[in-house]
Every structure is written in C-alpha cells, then in structure tokens.
From Swiss-Prot:
InterPro entries: ATP-cone_dom, NrdR-like_N, RNR_NrdR-like. Belongs to the NrdR family. The keyword tRNA processing does not apply. It comes from the Bacteria. HAMAP family: NrdR. Negatively regulates transcription of bacterial ribonucleotide reductase nrd genes and operons by binding to NrdR-boxes. Its cofactor is Zn(2+). Binds 1 zinc ion. This is Transcriptional repressor NrdR. GO terms for molecular function: ATP binding; DNA binding; zinc ion binding. GO terms for biological process: negative regulation of DNA-templated transcription. Residues 12-24 have a biased composition (Basic and acidic residues). Residues 1-24, 146-186 are annotated as: Disordered. The gene is nrdR.
Length: 186
C-alpha cells in the first residue's frame, strides 16, 4: 500500500485486528522510507454499487460520503462513534446485499433517515430538513408533529407529563432556583 506521507510503495503491517463490530479489519502500517505511521481498514465489498441521482446521473456509491453526511447531521450530538460506524456499515451492507447493482439516492436517503430517527431525533430533523429541502417553518412543524406522534395510536402527540415540573419560580418567590449543571473543562 502506498504511504500517504512520502508515496513509498513498501509499507509494512505492524498490527492487524478486527473492528469492534467485526465488519472490517483494522491494520496499523509503517513506512520504512519515511517512518510514517497510518491506519487502514479492509472491508468486504459484495458488489460495486451505482447511485442514480435525482437528475438521472449515475455515480459510484461512496461509503465515505455516506459517513460524512451522517457526521454532519450528528455534529455536536452525544452519539458514540461506534454507533455511527454501525449505522454506516449497516446501511452499506443493506445496499450491497439488496441484489441490485443500481440504487436510487432517494432509497439511500430514506435508509439514513430511518437510521438517524432511531439514533438521535435532532440529527434526524437536521438530515430531513436538507434531504427533503425544507423551505418554511411549516415544513419543520409537520416533521416534528409526525416525530412527536410516532408510536401513538392515530398519530396523536404525547400528552404533557403531569409529574413534570412547571416553569421554575424566580428566586425569592417561594420556589427553588433551578439547579446548575456542572461544566466539564475539556
């Protein structure tokens, strides 16, 4: 494998192990020419997929592009990297094992939305707003209404929790001041 630092062709594998979900082999490599160290991943690719865009244009499926689009939706969200990797691997595996050499970008978008909905509601809304090309606040309201009504009979939103506290009273008005969360200094 070519060294990404100096272009040398004689790199050596120093460590090799399966990834956490066993869907890839992680290899730690070193270049004897420059001493550079880097990591590669080896994954099974069942077939070469072609993505059919909305315009009709055909492009090769790019797993890294799928990863990047999910990463953008999940930016600054508390989701572990291994859960994101499992989502990306699951979508790629589902597409590759689907039996079709061509897959529409809409089908990929729907799989991503389905996966993000199970992973993180905020990321789901972020992705959906771009994927569905939201133009007005009403588009968000409709999506949030469907999201809040999911899983309830008739799609009704959850009723407010009776045990949930109301707005906190201001200090000195007979209520307690809201608790402050400790900040981590990372």
């Amino acid at each position: 494998m070519r060294c990404p630092y100096c272009g040398g062709l004689d790199t050596q594998v120093k460590d090799s192990r399966p990834s956490d979900d066993a869907s890839a082999i992680r290899r730690r490599r070193i270049c004897p020419d420059c001493g550079g160290r880097f990591t590669t991943f080896e994954r099974v690719q069942l077939r070469d997929l072609t993505v059919v865009k909305r315009s009709g244009r055909r492009v090769p499926f790019d797993r890294d592009k799928l990863q990047r689009s999910i990463d953008v939706a999940l930016r600054k969200r508390p989701v572990e990297a291994d859960r994101v990797e499992r989502l990306v691997s699951g979508i790629a595996r589902q597409l590759e094992s689907g039996g079709e050499a061509e897959v529409s970008s809409e089908a990929i978008g729907e799989l991503v939305m389905e996966g993000l909905k199970a992973l993180d509601d905020v990321a789901y809304v972020r992705f959906a707003s771009v994927y569905k090309n939201f133009r007005e606040a009403r588009d968000f309201e409709e999506l949030l209404g469907r999201l809040n009504g999911a899983g309830r009979p008739g799609g009704e939103p959850e009723p407010p929790d009776e045990a949930a506290p109301g707005p906190a009273a201001a200090p000195g008005e007979g209520g307690e001041a809201p608790a402050r969360r400790a900040r981590s200094r990372a």
